[in-house]
Amino acid sequence: MCDPTSESQLWRSSSQIPSPCLICRLDHIVMTVKNIEDTTMFYSKILGMEVTTFKGNRKALCFGDQKFNLHEVGKEFDPKAAHPVPGSLDVCLITEAPLEEVIERLKAFDVPIEEGPVFRTGAKGPILSIYFRDPDRNLLEVSSYVTS
């Protein structure tokens, strides 16, 4: 099997010309969690994500054109991350709802805001963000793009 950390990899060569990007968007992220039921309840009630079932009884959280596939720790599906652990995700999610509406929803469910609202830089420009944690202690940043 190819070892991507091997010193002999061609991608390490400084003589290679940078390639054009071959990726256009993110489809899904696999999130390893302690308890799938707690996770689906949190994300559906707090953020309004749609819980879907696929390939038998696997669960996903759908939003926009993306989704989080859920793996319960110790019951992951192959292939999987080298070291899948709950609480290791740090992700920024974009909302089109007023950020105040997200803040009110968090307050209504007693979810503490760790930081924010604060200005940050998103993939497409300035964003206003709040930070909070899910039941596995993953760091969630919910942001809206700043319009002039």
From Swiss-Prot:
SUPFAM superfamilies: Glyoxalase/Bleomycin resistance protein/Dihydroxybiphenyl dioxygenase (SSF54593). It holds the Pfam family Glyoxalase. InterPro entries: Glyas_Bleomycin-R_OHBP_Dase (IPR029068), Glyas_Fos-R_dOase_dom (IPR004360), GlyoxalaseI/FosfomycinResist (IPR050383), VOC (IPR037523). Residues 25-145 form the VOC domain. PANTHER family: GLYOXALASE DOMAIN-CONTAINING PROTEIN 5 (PTHR21366:SF14), GLYOXALASE FAMILY PROTEIN (PTHR21366). Belongs to the glyoxalase I family. This is Glyoxalase domain-containing protein 5. It comes from Mus musculus. The lineage of its organism: Eukaryota, Metazoa, Chordata, Craniata, Vertebrata. The gene is Glod5.
